[in-house]
Design a protein with these regions (language model features):
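Positively charged, low-complexity terminal tracts
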Residues: 1-136
Length: 136
């Protein structure tokens, strides 16, 4: 069972996701968008378009409202990207159960973890291929 040891700091990055989980379908819609952004971040990076990312994260925070900030949105998205990368590095024996246990340890809400898990296994070969090409 190759669990991924995710850093404790992700719990702080995922605080916004806990708030979104409590918002029901609207919160899940934001989470799905965050997952798409994390996917893009893994495959193309974020540094090249940092100014665009900053505006996008700020706009998302405005739509979410409450205590959401551009920094909290950025932290959540990049935290999700970190999860995707670390799980891809875990290898082919990494299972859905391993994914769920690994993400539970850093406080990712169960419904969001299940969605991210399905997304990960749908795109795992893309992530592994990208890592192989970029991390020689």
């Amino acid at each position: 069972m190759p669990l991924v040891n995710l850093p404790d700091r992700l719990a702080a990055d995922f605080a916004l996701l806990t708030t979104l989980a409590a918002a029901g379908e609207k919160g899940m819609a934001f989470f799905k968008q965050f997952t798409k952004l994390a996917h893009q971040s893994v495959l193309t990076g974020t540094d090249a378009e940092a100014a665009v990312d900053s505006k996008m994260f700020g706009a998302a925070a405005g739509k979410i409202g409450g205590d959401a900030t551009a920094a909290s949105v950025r932290g959540a998205v990049l935290g999700l990207a970190h999860v995707l990368v670390q799980c891809a590095k875990a290898g082919l024996r990494f299972s859905k159960n391993d994914f769920m246990l690994s993400t539970a340890a850093v406080g990712l809400p169960r419904g969001q973890a299940a969605y991210l898990c399905d997304h990960f296994f749908l795109h795992a070969s893309d992530y592994r291929k990208h890592l192989k090409q970029t991390h020689k």
